Amino acid sequence: VRVLIVGNRGDADPGLVGTRLSEVGFTFERNEREYPREWKSLAGIDVVVLLGSEWSVYWEGNEKEVAAEVDLVHTAMKRGVPIFGICFGAQLIAHALGGSVTRSQTPEVGWHDVSSTAYPDVLSGSWLQ
């Protein structure tokens, strides 16, 4: 399975998610958010992973990069390529699908227990620790 990972240049390491995907035999291509003109195409890509970022989709100054990533989401959806977003990546998917992303009145940071009744094995392993 080939995964396209989109992240910021200095922070494009897929971390524990990448470790787990590698353990099950997935391979990666990487696109750096700051350079959408240099992005690899979706040809042969089975899954898109949008990593977190210090950016927000509503920030001024990164509109072109956000628009390029929104286009990538739309193209992946049209081709039936699954998309997984982490933090900023999830914001971007919501934005691309017409949702609103706004600044919170107060910061929200914390760790929460997550469980799945439908797919209990998906949460096992070090990648979600």
Annotated model-derived regions:
Residues 1-4:
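Extreme N-terminal starter segment of soluble prokaryotic enzymes
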Residues 18-84:
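Flexible gly/pro-rich beta->alpha loop and the following alpha-helix that scaffold active-site loops
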